[in-house]
């Protein structure tokens, strides 16, 4: 667990890191971050609580408790990952643990959108390829350098062509996934727009 506070920002071209494998279909958002942790006033503490109940239940042998995975940043999952409630806390918890990209068979739509909105790309692969990658990552440390533009995961031994929605790809390459930075970089346009909105005249005074 890195609890990395260097969060994604602006255009993202590449993501490098070690893979961590989490096996199981239909892993829902309540398993990713249990409901009792949603009372937090910000997301900063969520990283330590990701998969809290699963980790407690199997007492230290969860992939997120393994010392071998403490610096992992690329999560490999199975089908329908992130189903259940639409809580944005789930991708926020994963990001604060250190996850910067997810490769899976499929994702719940809202979870996918919430990931994109905070700079975590979600790639898809066929079932057998996911199983192969999970097996490799469990046997030995598996590292990838992922090219967003090429939708390609590479290392010294092999490469894997990933599936990534073209609309999402462009958001990452252009940095437009990052709404906050986009707004801050265009304050002049915002101020100009305010001049033409009569119901915001109090801001101009």
Which residues does each predicted region cover?
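N-terminal, positively charged, Ser/Thr/Ala/Gly-biased leader segments
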Residues: 1-35, 179-205
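Short, acidic Gly/Pro/Ser/Thr-rich loop/turn segments
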Residues: 27-29, 58, 169-170
């Amino acid at each position: 667990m890195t609890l990395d506070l260097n969060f994604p920002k602006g255009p993202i071209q590449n993501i490098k890191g070690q893979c961590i494998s989490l096996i199981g279909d239909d892993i829902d958002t309540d398993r990713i971050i249990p409901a009792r942790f949603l009372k937090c006033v910000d997301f900063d503490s969520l990283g330590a609580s990701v998969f809290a109940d699963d980790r407690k239940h199997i007492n230290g042998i969860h992939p997120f408790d393994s010392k071998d995975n403490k610096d992992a940043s690329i999560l490999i999952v199975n089908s329908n990952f992130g189903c259940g409630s639409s809580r944005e806390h789930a991708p926020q918890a994963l990001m604060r643990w250190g996850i910067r990209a997810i490769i899976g068979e499929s994702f719940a739509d809202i979870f996918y959108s919430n990931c994109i909105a905070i700079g975590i790309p979600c790639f898809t692969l066929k079932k057998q390829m996911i199983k192969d990658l999970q097996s490799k990552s469990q046997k030995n440390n598996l590292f990838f350098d992922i090219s967003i533009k090429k939708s390609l995961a590479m290392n010294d031994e092999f490469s894997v062509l990933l599936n990534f929605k073209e609309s999402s790809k462009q958001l990452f390459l252009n940095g437009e996934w990052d709404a906050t930075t986009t707004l801050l970089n265009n304050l002049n346009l915002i101020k100009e727009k305010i001049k033409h909105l009569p119901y915001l005249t109090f801001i101009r005074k």
